[in-house]
């Protein structure tokens, strides 16, 4: 019998204290009775009999309470047994000493007294042993497999306590096996108690030597437990393995360790940190390995060795390439050597001729990534994206350490970064990573001392890098570096601003020269591949810098707009020119829009509004461009554009509000929706080809890139729905694909559903039911008009499944979703009885089977609401039903779901 209302399972501080006091009472009772009453053959026999009987009860409350009492009683008795055992050994030693002192056959009162004491202890120990056996066999053996997980957990927790308290009696396979068996328990709570108990045992070296049999039997199970679906169990399993690794020689094989090392990349931070401790203590700080001593020794010997171990480990981890995750996992254990940036940069700048410590290219790339990850972790003070729910609030001490680290980073890299950039200036990946370091600078350091020469060196290197590279990641990092250093509040602003202006003058000069040649040469109709490449590079550089810096005074807008208009009229420009030109024009308008204020002249606003309209028309035109890349870029820009302007309008700026006159009309909404249908949800036909392994990898990579683009397009469109730029009813077309495309887009559609519901519960519910109604109508139209709806058809089954999945999105809080679910039923009933001729029940409503669809939402109704919905249904139904054939089955099923 399940009685779910008794003290031990009630929540709250009062009942928690009650349980603690109950357990303490049992311990105190035994302690107070241990001198005499405990052995009167009445009290304990009575209590043990009572608890054993109640522990076999069918009533859960009795069984749980008596099992807890019996286990705590045995724990207390074990302590008494331990004390008696100590006293007995002391008495025996005293007896032996006293006996040696007596000569001849003389009797001694003291000797007789000790002998009586020793026998008394033996008698008491026998009594206690009988009590322990009675409780263990009568309660533990029956209850450690109880159906209630709390009871099983109590048994395992206490047996672990007995083993730790009195290992001489309990530390053997006869008792350990129960903990081992329960490692396989279905409930995480029980598995957790097993692991915590084992941690207490494996943490004591004197006990580990007696665990050999248990370790050999259950090691594989423990090694697999960091994969446990319960996070806390996984973390404690990793901590247990750490203890086993430290205290049991060679218990973990190389394969076991390799498996466990990979958990440093897991998204769950506590598990990753536990794995980081395992990796650090087992691999990085291990002293007995070969190649540990660097050839040159010197100042950074220990740190250099650890860094090389870390780099080798990362390169050998074929499954993962996430340096930031690896560093975050090790941060709590290896913070000292991970903050040794002087060692890291010295290792990079050394030449192989000096002492043989130089790294190869792959090692250098990883070390630069490690430097960036450690700098970010030290400066930001929180885990990387995807690990940890939110940024943690730093304590005063942590904040102080963070500021000291930022200062240390700035002082060191101000001098070293220009040298590193000079050394690796031709390597795009290395340079892109190195250029991200200045964003973590404490710029106030520049005002102390005289770092002008270092700043000049940095700006000179960045300028050379921009000239050398066309890689987007390098250019973006360069533009961001200028943006970070160009903070107007700092002492270096004028110096950096001057360098930035000089660089952009040169970039614009190159672009203007190319554009002049382009227009003069038969107005752009004849362009060779070299010119296209140069134009692409020039436009790309300017676009990247325009993203981070306002280039309005260079009059870039007119130049790029002319290219877009030319493409609209003639359609002959290559994609490599169109995409950066489109991006430049977009950024130009964004900077102009950002400059609009309440005091802007009307002429400026009218001019800007005209340009906004022209650009939006260009983007809408490019939605039908022959090149897929141009279509997708135009769509993304248009979505962002609409979102930004809608936000601008929400700021209640009356002048700026005029910018929104054209947004978003029905025609534009239809175009956007049609674009999503064609580019996201329409499946491309795959040709069956015989591909080599290399070609298969490339094909798979292309598919992933294509999926990423589709997700970006869908997310951009869904944002418009969420922020009411596009009508919420447009989401109905998206929701239709929720189940069909769940693996690819399910998270985006679900988030859209959640956000729209948060904005407007009623309208969101109407959109859901509209989606199902449209699918139902399509299903009906696809069937033979003379036949009734086929409930077994694939399309109808898919509709029911979609409705069920929609129902699951409401969660368990029926009160919170009350209005939405009620609206779904109301709209569904009205649709089901649409075009019904009369209410006498003689004519079957054409949409009656739709009731089967909305019955999936019945379990989300509160009981009072079920009665209301049932009453609303009765308005459309005559009682009793004159016809009870199969055609009326949907109505009967729906009514039953409401009456359940």
Task: Label each PLM-derived region with a short phrase.
Residues 205-208, 469-508, 519-554, 575, ...:
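Charge-patterned, phosphorylation-rich low-complexity C-terminal interaction regions
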Residues 261-308, 580, 587, 730-758, ...:
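Eukaryotic acidic, Ser/Thr-rich intrinsically disordered low-complexity regions
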Residues 11-18, 33-43, 84, 88, ...:
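Alpha-solenoid helical repeat scaffolds
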Residues 76-80, 92-103, 184-185, 265-271, ...:
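Eukaryote-specific, cytoplasm-facing alpha-helical/coiled-coil scaffolding segments in long proteins
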Residues 16-54, 60, 64, 68, ...:
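Extended alpha-helical scaffolding segments
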Residues 316-323, 328-371, 375-382, 434-439, ...:
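Extended alpha-helical scaffolding regions
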Residues 26, 66, 70-73, 125, ...:
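Hydrophobic core/packing positions within alpha-helical solenoid repeats
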């Amino acid at each position: 019998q399940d009685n779910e209302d008794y003290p031990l399972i009630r929540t709250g501080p009062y009942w928690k204290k009650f349980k603690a006091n109950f357990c303490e009472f049992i311990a105190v009772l035994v302690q107070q009775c241990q001198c005499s009453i405990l052995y009167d053959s009445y009290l304990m026999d009575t209590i043990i009999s009572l608890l054993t009987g109640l522990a076999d009860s069918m009533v859960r409350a009795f069984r749980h309470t008596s099992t807890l009492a019996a286990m705590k009683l045995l724990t207390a008795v074990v302590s008494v047994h331990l004390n008696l055992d100590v006293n007995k050994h002391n008495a025996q030693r005293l007896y032996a000493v006293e006996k040696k002192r007596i000569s001849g056959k003389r009797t001694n009162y003291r000797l007789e007294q000790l002998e009586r004491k020793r026998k008394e202890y033996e008698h008491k120990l026998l009594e206690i042993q009988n009590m322990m056996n009675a409780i263990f066999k009568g309660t533990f053996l029956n209850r450690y497999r109880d159906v209630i997980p709390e009871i099983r957990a109590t048994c395992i927790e206490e047996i672990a306590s007995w083993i730790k308290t009195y290992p001489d009696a309990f530390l053997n396979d006869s008792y350990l096996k129960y903990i081992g068996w329960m490692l396989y328990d279905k409930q995480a709570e029980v598995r957790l108690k097993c692991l915590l108990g084992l941690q207490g045992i494996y943490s004591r070296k004197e006990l580990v030597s007696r665990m050999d049999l248990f370790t050999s039997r259950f090691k594989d199970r423990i090694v697999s437990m960091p994969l446990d679906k319960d996070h806390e169990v996984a973390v404690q399993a990793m901590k247990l393995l750490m203890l086993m690794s430290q205290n049991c020689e060679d218990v973990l094989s190389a394969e076991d360790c390799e498996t466990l090392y990979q958990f440093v990349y897991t998204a769950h931070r506590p598990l990753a940190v536990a794995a980081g401790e395992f990796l650090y203590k087992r691999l990085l700080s291990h002293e007995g390995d070969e190649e540990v001593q660097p050839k040159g020794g010197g100042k950074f010997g220990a740190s250099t060795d650890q860094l090389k171990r870390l780099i080798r480990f990362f390169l050998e981890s074929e499954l993962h390439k996430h340096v930031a995750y690896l560093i975050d996992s090790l941060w709590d254990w290896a913070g000292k050597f991970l903050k040794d940036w002087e060692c890291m940069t010295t290792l990079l700048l050394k030449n192989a001729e000096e002492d043989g410590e130089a790294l190869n290219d792959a090692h250098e790339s990883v070390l630069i990534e490690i430097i960036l990850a450690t700098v970010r972790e030290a400066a930001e003070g929180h885990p990387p994206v995807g690990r940890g729910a939110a940024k943690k609030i730093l304590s005063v001490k942590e904040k102080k350490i963070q500021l000291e680290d930022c200062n240390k980073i700035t002082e060191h890299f101000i001098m070293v970064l220009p040298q590193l950039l000079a050394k690796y200036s031709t390597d795009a990946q290395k340079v892109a990573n190195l250029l991200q370091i200045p964003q973590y600078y404490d710029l106030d350091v520049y005002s102390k001392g005289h770092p002008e020469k270092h700043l000049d060196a940095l700006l000179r290197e960045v300028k050379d890098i921009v000239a050398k590279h066309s890689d987007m990641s390098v250019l973006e990092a360069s533009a961001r570096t200028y943006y970070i250093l160009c903070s107007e509040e700092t002492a270096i602003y004028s110096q950096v601003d001057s360098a930035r202006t000089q660089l952009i003058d040169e970039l614009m000069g190159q672009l203007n020269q190319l554009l002049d040649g382009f227009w003069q040469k038969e107005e752009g109709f004849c362009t060779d591949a070299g010119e296209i490449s140069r134009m692409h590079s020039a436009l790309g550089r300017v676009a990247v810098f325009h993203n981070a810096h306002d280039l309005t005074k260079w009059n870039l807008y007119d130049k790029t707009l002319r290219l877009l208009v030319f493409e609209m009229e003639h359609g002959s420009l290559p994609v490599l020119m169109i995409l950066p030109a489109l991006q430049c024009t977009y950024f130009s308008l964004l900077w102009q829009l950002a400059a609009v204020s309440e005091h802007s002249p009307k002429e400026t606003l009218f001019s800007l509004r005209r340009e906004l309209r022209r650009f939006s028309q260009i983007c809408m035109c490019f939605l039908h461009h022959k090149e897929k890349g141009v279509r997708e870029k135009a769509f993304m820009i248009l979505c962002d554009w609409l979102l930004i302007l809608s936000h601008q309008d929400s700021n209640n700026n009356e002048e700026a509000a005029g910018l929104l006159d054209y947004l978003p009309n029905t025609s534009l909404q239809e175009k956007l929706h049609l674009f999503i249908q064609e580019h996201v949800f329409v499946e491309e036909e795959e040709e069956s080809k015989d591909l080599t392994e290399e070609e298969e990898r490339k094909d798979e990579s292309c598919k992933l890139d294509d999926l990423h683009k589709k997700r970006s397009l869908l997310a951009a469109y869904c944002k418009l729905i969420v922020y009411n730029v596009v009508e919420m009813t447009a989401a109905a077309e998206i929701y239709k694909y929720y189940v069909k495309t769940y693996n690819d887009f399910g998270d985006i559609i679900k988030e859209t559903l959640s956000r729209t519901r948060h904005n407007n519960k009623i309208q969101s519910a109407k959109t859901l039911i509209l989606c199902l109604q449209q699918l139902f109508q399509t299903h009906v139209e696809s069937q033979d008009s003379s036949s009734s709806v086929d409930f077994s058809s694939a399309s109808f089954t898919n509709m029911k499944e979609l409705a069920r999945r929609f129902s699951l999105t409401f969660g368990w809080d029926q009160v919170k979703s009350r209005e939405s679910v009620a609206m779904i039923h109301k709209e569904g009933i009205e649709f089901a009885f649409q075009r019904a001729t009369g209410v006498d029940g003689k004519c079957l409503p054409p949409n009656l089977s739709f009731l089967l669809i909305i019955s999936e939402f019945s379990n989300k109704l509160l009981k009072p609401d079920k009665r209301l919905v049932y009453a609303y249904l009765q308005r459309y139904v005559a009682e009793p039903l004159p016809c009870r054939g199969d055609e009326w089955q949907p109505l009967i099923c729906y009514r039953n779901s409401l009456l359940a």
